[in-house]
Swiss-Prot record:
Reaction catalyzed: L-seryl-[protein] + ATP = O-phospho-L-seryl-[protein] + ADP + H(+); L-threonyl-[protein] + ATP = O-phospho-L-threonyl-[protein] + ADP + H(+)
Domain annotation Protein kinase: ranges: 174-432
Localization per record: Membrane
Protein name as catalogued: Dual specificity protein kinase shkB
Pfam families reported for this sequence: PK_Tyr_Ser-Thr, SH2
Alphabetized GO MF terms: ATP binding; protein serine kinase activity; protein serine/threonine kinase activity; protein tyrosine kinase activity
Originating gene: shkB
Length: 653
C-alpha cells in the first residue's frame, strides 16, 4: 500500500489505543462511583461521597465526549483507507487488495496496540479474538472478549424459553412499601403472583437501550436454566419494556448482608456454626453454577439469600457470564463489587472462574469476623488496587481461627488464580465440613469420632449416637440404655424437647466433662460430676438466681459457667444475695476456685473442702439430675419431663 494508507493505518492504531485507554478509565470511574454509592448508603453523612460522585460523573461525561470524537475520527480514517484501496485497485481480483481489506477489518476492532509494525498484513493472532466493546450493567462496567449471552446457535431457543416463562404484567401484584432491597438496576419488592408470595425484581428505568434489554433477557434465560437447592429459584419474568420484572421465590430472612448486622443476643445472629454452613451452601451453589459453565462475578453477602430454615441460596445473576465448556481461553473485563474483586479483575486482566473463588474467600472472612473487607482501609479505587494488587494485602486472619480455616482463606485469596482451589475441590474434599468440626469440637479424640461417623451432619438421633459412641469408646454390649451413666450423658447432650445430639452441644459438653482419651474414664467422670448434689448443668446465672430465690441461706447450685470448661457455684449468702463463684479446671492439676491456690481432684472434693469459706451449706434439690439420682437410689421410675423446673428463658449459659 502507498505511504498515505500506511500513515492512516498508523493513525488508526494510535486512536484505537486512545479509545481503549478512555474505556479503561471509564471502567475505573464506574467502579469507584459504585464504591462511593455503597459507602454513602451506609454513611450517616453522605455529603462527601455525594460531592465525589458528582465530580466523577462530570469527568466521565467529558471522557465520553472525547471518546465519541475519537471514534468519529476513526470512521473518517477508515473511509479514507477504503477510498484509497479502491483507487489503488488495478484488477478486479487483485489479491493484495482483498488481503489488505480483510486485515483492515481485523485491525479496526481487534487490534494489537503494542504492534509497531505498520505492515497491515502482520497482526498478532493472539489479539484477533479480542473485542473491546463495553456494556454498563447494573451500575458496573464490563468489557468482554466472550459473549455475555449464550452462543448464536441457541439464541432462538433462549427466546422460546423466555416466552415460556413469560408472566403477564396484570398477574404481578406488589406493594411499593414492601421493598426488600434496591440497587443500581432498580428495586426488589415482596409481591404476589398467581396466588403465591414471591420476590419481584423490578427495573426502575423507563427508557431501555438495546443493550439493557439484551442483558435483561440474558439474565432471564440464564436463570431459567438453573435448578439447584442453593441457587435462587426463578419463577418467571415480565418482558414488557415498560415493566421489566424478574419473579423469584421469596427468601424470608433476606440477605446474609443484612443478617450480619444482627446482635449477638438475637436468634438471627450468625454464629461460627452458621457462618460455616452459609459458606458450605454457597460452595454447593457455586459448584453447580461453575459446572454449568457460568461465572457469577458478583459474589458477596448481599447476593446470598436465606430462607426460613437457614438454607442459603446464591442470587443476582445480572453480571454472570457464560464460559465455553472446556475452554482454556479466559474472559476480559471488570464486573462486580470492588471490595470482593480478585486482583486480576481489579486491573482488567484476563480471568476465569477463580475470580469467584477469591470473592468467596472475602465473604467467608466477613461472615466470621462481622467486619467490612479491609476495614475501610481504602477510600478510593486506586488505593484498593495499590493495596490488593501491588502490595498483595489481604484481610487480617485472627489467631483463633482453626488452622484449616486459615489455610483455606490463604489458598482462596492467593494472588495467583492457578493456586486457588475450585469450588468443586472444596466441596469434594469436605473442607468446610472438617473446619466446622475443628471449630466446634476442641477435644481431638471427639473430633475424630464425629469425623468418622457423622462427617457433614450437624445433628444426629440419640439412638444412633449412643451406639456409635459406645463402640468408639471401646464398649460393645457392656453399656445398657438403663445404665445411669448413659442416662446422665443423654441429659447433658439432648434437650428435653428433642431427641437429637447437635455437633455444637457435643463439643461444648466435652469442654466440661472431657477429655475423651479413655472411654471408661470418660463415663466415670460423667457420673462423678452429674451425681454431685446440687448439680444443674447448663443453667444460666439468671435461672440459678430464680431457683435460689426464697431458699435458706447457704443453699447452692453447681452449674456450667458461661465460659466453656469452667464451672460456677451459685449460692445465697447471709445477706440474701446471690453470689456466683467461678471454678476452673486445669488438665493434670484439677479444680480450683478463681483466684484460689489449691487444686482438688474432683468437684466434690472442692465443695467439701471449701464450703465453710464460701458459706455454702445445703445443695439445691431439684432438676433432672437430682431426680435421676433419687430414682436410681430408690428404684423408682424416672420421669424426665417432670424433673424440669419451669423458669423464664435465658439466652446465656
Amino acid at each position: 500500500m502507498n505511504d498515505k494508507i500506511s500513515k492512516l493505518e498508523s493513525s488508526i492504531l494510535q486512536l484505537t489505543e486512545e479509545v481503549k485507554q478512555l474505556e479503561s478509565k471509564q471502567a475505573s470511574k464506574e467502579l469507584e462511583i459504585r464504591t462511593l454509592v455503597d459507602n454513602a448508603i451506609n454513611s450517616q453523612n453522605p455529603a462527601q461521597e455525594r460531592e465525589l460522585i458528582n465530580k466523577l460523573f462530570t469527568e466521565s461525561l467529558i471522557d465520553l465526549k472525547l471518546k465519541a470524537e475519537k471514534i468519529q475520527t476513526l470512521e473518517r480514517y477508515r473511509q479514507e483507507i477504503i477510498t484509497n484501496l479502491l483507487v489503488e485497485q488495478k484488477q478486479p481480483n487483485d489479491t493484495s487488495i482483498i488481503s489488505a481489506w480483510e486485515q483492515l477489518k481485523i485491525s479496526s476492532f481487534r487490534i494489537n496496540p503494542n504492534n509497531n509494525n505498520n505492515n497491515s498484513n502482520n497482526t498478532n493472532s493472539s489479539d484477533s479474538n479480542q473485542n473491546y466493546s463495553s456494556v454498563i450493567l447494573n451500575g458496573s462496567l464490563t468489557e468482554d472478549s466472550t459473549s455475555t449471552i449464550s452462543p448464536d446457535s441457541t439464541k432462538n431457543r433462549d427466546e422460546e424459553e423466555i416466552i415460556r416463562w413469560e408472566i403477564d404484567r396484570n398477574e404481578i401484584s406488589y406493594n411499593r412499601e414492601a421493598k426488600l432491597g434496591s440497587g443500581a438496576f432498580g428495586s426488589v419488592y415482596k409481591g404476589i403472583v398467581r396466588g403465591k408470595e414471591v420476590a419481584i425484581k423490578k427495573l426502575t428505568q423507563t427508557v431501555f437501550e438495546e443493550n439493557t434489554m439484551n442483558e435483561f433477557k440474558k439474565e432471564v434465560s440464564l436463570m431459567a436454566k438453573l435448578r439447584n437447592p442453593h441457587l435462587l429459584l426463578f419463577m418467571g419474568a415480565c418482558t414488557a419494556p415498560e415493566d421489566l420484572s424478574i419473579v423469584t421465590e421469596l427468601m424470608p430472612k433476606g440477605s446474609v448482608h443484612s443478617l450480619l448486622r444482627a446482635k449477638e443476643d438475637t436468634s438471627d445472629f450468625i454464629t461460627f456454626k452458621r457462618a460455616i454452613l452459609i459458606a458450605r451452601d454457597t460452595v454447593l451453589g457455586m459448584t453447580w453454577l461453575h459446572a454449568s459453565n457460568i461465572l457469577h462475578l458478583d459474589l458477596k453477602p448481599a447476593n446470598l439469600l436465606v430462607d426460613q430454615n437457614w438454607v442459603v441460596k446464591v442470587a443476582d445473576f445480572g453480571l454472570s457470564k457464560y464460559m465455553k465448556p472446556d475452554s482454556k481461553d479466559k474472559l476480559l473485563g471488570q464486573a462486580g463489587s470492588p471490595l470482593y474483586m480478585a486482583p486480576e479483575m481489579l486491573v482488567n486482566q484476563p480471568y476465569d472462574g477463580k475470580v469467584d473463588v477469591f470473592s468467596f474467600s472475602i465473604l467467608l472472612w466477613e461472615l466470621l469476623t462481622k467486619q467490612e473487607p479491609y476495614n475501610k482501609l481504602y477510600s478510593s479505587y486506586p488505593q484498593l488496587v495499590e493495596g490488593v494488587v501491588n502490595k498483595k494485602n489481604r484481610p487480617i486472619i485472627p489467631d483463633y481461627f482453626p488452622t484449616r480455616l486459615k489455610d483455606l482463606l490463604a489458598r482462596c485469596w492467593d494472588h495467583y488464580p492457578s493456586r486457588r482451589p475450585s469450588f468443586a475441590e472444596i466441596s469434594k474434599q469436605r473442607i468446610l465440613e472438617t473446619i466446622l468440626i475443628d471449630g466446634l469440637i476442641l477435644d481431638s479424640s471427639a473430633r475424630q469420632f464425629w469425623s468418622q461417623y457423622y462427617m457433614g451432619k450437624e445433628e444426629v438421633p440419640w439412638n444412633s449416637f449412643i451406639v456409635n459412641f459406645s463402640l468408639y469408646c471401646g464398649f460393645e454390649s457392656n453399656l445398657s440404655a438403663d445404665d445411669i451413666k448413659i442416662k446422665f450423658l443423654k441429659l447433658l447432650l439432648v434437650p428435653v424437647d428433642s431427641d437429637m445430639v447437635t455437633i455444637d452441644n457435643f463439643g461444648k459438653i466435652l469442654t466440661w466433662v472431657g477429655p475423651l482419651t479413655n472411654g471408661r474414664e470418660f463415663f466415670d467422670k460423667v457420673y462423678s460430676i452429674c451425681s454431685i448434689k446440687g448439680f444443674m448443668a447448663a443453667t444460666s446465672s439468671k435461672n440459678a438466681s430464680q431457683y435460689l430465690a426464697g431458699k435458706k441461706t447457704g443453699t447452692y447450685i453447681l452449674r456450667f459457667s458461661s465460659d466453656p470448661g469452667s464451672y460456677a457455684i451459685s449460692y445465697l449468702n447471709k445477706n440474701k444475695e446471690i453470689i456466683h463463684a467461678r471454678v476452673i479446671y486445669k488438665q493434670g492439676s484439677g479444680y480450683i476456685h478463681h483466684g484460689g491456690q489449691t487444686h482438688y481432684a474432683t468437684l466434690d472434693d472442692l465443695i467439701k473442702n471449701t464450703f465453710k469459706s464460701l458459706g455454702i451449706k445445703e445443695p439445691f434439690e431439684g432438676g433432672p439430675f437430682h431426680a435421676l439420682t433419687v430414682a436410681a437410689s430408690s428404684s423408682k421410675p424416672f420421669n424426665i419431663a417432670g424433673a424440669y423446673i419451669p423458669v423464664a428463658p435465658s439466652k446465656k449459659i
